């Protein structure tokens, strides 16, 4: 289906940006249904932990996961882990729904040893015009949308470098035209609805 194609496009971007090494561990913050947590298992051979504040989503994620994945209830703004506890830390379209976005991002960086990847909703996208304006529509209600520059600005003052921005899903919906357009749109325009920012933790 269309949703599956969109998820796979986003997943491809995340895998390429993380570039996992042998034995590395991963914390997926705001894992929700566990879609990305499960989907990253083939490229992560270390420990994987999915964290979410919603007990209902965690129960759903556990039921769907046949692997050795630990799911825990945790607040993104106060993660129950030591500094540099995980090699890789991800948070996919989570920061957009947290009021204290800077505090949550600082926590992600704190518990990361090598690399952090966050997925955000891109304000410079067709999807924002369709779903994001005003208070937002449907599942995007109350979400915060970021321009690529604002997304990079979230990392100001944090111990990271090598920041990189990628986007995917230029045309919403995932139909035939959207799939055709996806590979033909110049990536430097950064107009995809899904905005991925990757950063290396300094001192790793």
Show where each model-derived region lies.
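A short glycine-rich, Lys/Arg-flanked "PGG" loop and its adjoining helix->strand segment in the class I
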Residues: 102-116
């Amino acid at each position: 289906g269309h949703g599956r194609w969109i998820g796979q496009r986003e997943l491809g971007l995340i895998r390429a940006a993380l570039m996992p090494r042998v034995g590395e561990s991963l914390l997926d913050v705001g894992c929700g249904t566990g879609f990305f947590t499960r989907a990253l298992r083939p490229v992560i051979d270390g420990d994987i932990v999915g964290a979410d504040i919603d007990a209902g989503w965690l129960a759903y994620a556990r039921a769907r996961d046949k692997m050795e994945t630990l799911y825990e209830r945790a607040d993104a703004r106060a993660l129950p882990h030591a500094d540099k506890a995980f090699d890789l830390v991800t948070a996919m379209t989570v920061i957009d729904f947290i009021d204290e976005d800077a505090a949550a991002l600082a926590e992600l960086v704190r518990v990361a040893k090598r690399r952090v990847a966050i997925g955000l909703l891109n304000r410079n996208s067709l999807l924002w015009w369709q779903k994001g304006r005003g208070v937002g529509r449907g599942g995007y209600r109350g979400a915060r949308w970021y321009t690529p520059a604002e997304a990079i600005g979230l990392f100001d003052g944090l111990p990271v470098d090598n920041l990189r921005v990628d986007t995917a899903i230029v045309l919403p919906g995932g139909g035939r035209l959207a799939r055709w357009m996806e590979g033909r749109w110049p990536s430097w325009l950064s107009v995809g609805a899904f905005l991925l920012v990757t950063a290396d933790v300094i001192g790793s």
